[in-house]
Swiss-Prot record:
<dbReference type="InterPro" id="IPR009132">
    <property type="entry name" value="TAAR_fam"/>
</dbReference>
<dbReference type="GO" id="GO:0001594">
    <property type="term" value="F:trace-amine receptor activity"/>
</dbReference>
<comment type="function">
    <text>Olfactory receptor activated by several primary trace amines, including isoamylamine. Activated by isoamylamine and cyclohexylamine, but not to the corresponding alcohols, isoamylalcohol and cyclohexanol. This receptor is probably mediated by the G(s)-class of G-proteins which activate adenylate cyclase.</text>
</comment>
<feature type="topological domain" description="Cytoplasmic">
    <location>
        <begin position="224"/>
        <end position="256"/>
    </location>
</feature>
<feature type="region of interest" description="Extracellular Loop 2 (ECL2)">
    <location>
        <begin position="173"/>
        <end position="186"/>
    </location>
</feature>
<feature type="topological domain" description="Extracellular">
    <location>
        <begin position="90"/>
        <end position="150"/>
    </location>
</feature>
<feature type="topological domain" description="Cytoplasmic">
    <location>
        <begin position="308"/>
        <end position="342"/>
    </location>
</feature>
<feature type="transmembrane region" description="Helical; Name=1">
    <location>
        <begin position="36"/>
        <end position="56"/>
    </location>
</feature>
<dbReference type="GO" id="GO:0007186">
    <property type="term" value="P:G protein-coupled receptor signaling pathway"/>
</dbReference>
<keyword id="KW-0675">Receptor</keyword>
<feature type="transmembrane region" description="Helical; Name=2">
    <location>
        <begin position="69"/>
        <end position="89"/>
    </location>
</feature>
<dbReference type="InterPro" id="IPR017452">
    <property type="entry name" value="GPCR_Rhodpsn_7TM"/>
</dbReference>
<comment type="similarity">
    <text>Belongs to the G-protein coupled receptor 1 family.</text>
</comment>
<feature type="topological domain" description="Extracellular">
    <location>
        <begin position="278"/>
        <end position="286"/>
    </location>
</feature>
<feature type="glycosylation site" description="N-linked (GlcNAc...) asparagine">
    <location>
        <position position="18"/>
    </location>
</feature>
<keyword id="KW-0472">Membrane</keyword>
<dbReference type="InterPro" id="IPR050569">
    <property type="entry name" value="TAAR"/>
</dbReference>
Length: 342
């Protein structure tokens, strides 16, 4: 999601003629390093999420309510890496927008939509995990196929309507005279918000889903620890392999959820705080800081497949099938990705 820095000195702005690029003092070496780092993040985002998309779509063993939510989120993160990040990279490195005003509005709208869609998916997955861990007896009757479809529809439709409606109507920049002058002067493309819409965006699109996620994952963590302690206190002669496996899974679930929550907050909290606070500081935050915050938010989509790779054995097994070409064999869709279950 884009942010903007509005410079105070617009005296050099041409009143007539072609728009120019904002001045930049970055050396070739600095730009090269930036391109390499951002390209690396893009490649991981695209191919990491593509592995998740192929795996869950192909292997029947992965067809579950939770994984369909993960599949949809991976699609969101893949689109962010494939459609949004390349243009954002050029804009961030060159400090200029070369792709026209019309595409600027589409890019800003789609960028905002995908960023919010990814956040809403994380919240939906938290709800799914809450019922699976804290109310397992009600899970199958609550998280039905119909419920998953409704969650997915909301995760995509609400951000799309909000993002495209806000950007195309230009309500987010209403009353911002300095922004209008900047756009008229330079080849510049960034998403910014006035005080009203900055507050609305922070409250509805970050604080609310973030609070829900923190509350849910906190509850899941407590329940998982309680299950682990209960299994640990049982007499040795009543423990079986299944109970030991359950204890291990509970601990792993609590650890994974903590990492997911920590990565989410680390990536998105600074960006949304800038959205909230910068309008009250007369948009004085340096552009290099805002660029860093934008890419930190993008990095959440880069981290999601990495988290799966480290903590979900099925991801590594599916990746092995894809890389080795086993996925092209007949009946490969029925391959067992959970050998420890047998």
């Amino acid at each position: 999601m884009d942010l903007i820095y509005i410079p105070e000195d617009l005296s050099s702005c041409p009143k007539f003629g072609n728009k120019s690029c904002p001045p930049t003092n970055r050396s070739f070496r600095v730009r090269l390093i930036m391109y390499l780092l951002m390209t690396g993040a893009m490649v991981i985002t695209i191919f990491g999420n593509l592995v998740i998309i192929i795996s869950i779509s192909h292997f029947k063993q992965l067809h579950s309510p939770t994984n369909f939510l993960i599949l949809s989120m991976a699609t969101t993160d893949f689109l962010l890496g494939f459609v949004i990040m390349p243009y954002s990279m050029v804009r961030s490195v060159e400090s200029c927008w070369y792709f026209g005003d019309s595409f600027c509005k589409f890019h800003a709208s789609f960028d905002m939509m995908l960023s919010l869609t990814s956040i809403f998916h994380l919240c939906s997955i938290a709800i799914d995990r809450f019922y699976a861990v804290c109310a397992p007896l009600h899970y199958t009757t609550t998280m039905t196929a119909s419920m998953i479809k409704r969650l997915l529809f909301f995760c995509w439709a609400a951000p799309a309507l909000f993002s495209f409606g806000l950007v195309l109507s230009e309500a987010n920049v209403s009353g911002m005279q300095s922004y209008e002058i900047l756009i008229a002067c330079f080849n510049f493309c960034a998403l910014t918000f006035n005080k009203f819409w900055g507050t609305i965006l922070f409250t509805t699109c970050f604080f609310t889903p973030g609070s829900i996620m923190v509350g849910i994952y906190g509850k899941i963590f407590i329940v998982s620890r309680r299950h682990a302690r209960a299994l640990g206190n049982m007499p040795e002669n009543t423990k079986g392999a299944g109970r030991n496996l359950s204890k291990k899974k509970d601990r792993k679930a609590a650890k994974t959820l903590g990492i997911v929550m920590g990565v989410f907050l680390a990536c998105w909290l600074p960006c949304f705080l800038a959205v909230l606070i910068d309008p009250y500081l007369d948009y004085s935050t340096p552009i290099i800081v805002l660029d860093l915050l934008v890419w930190l938010g993008y990095f959440n989509s880069t981290c999601n497949p990495l988290i799966h790779g480290f903590f979900y054995p099925w991801f590594r097994k599916a990746l092995e099938h894809i890389v080795s070409g086993k996925i092209f064999r007949s009946n490969s869709d029925t391959a067992n990705l959970f050998p420890e279950a047998h």
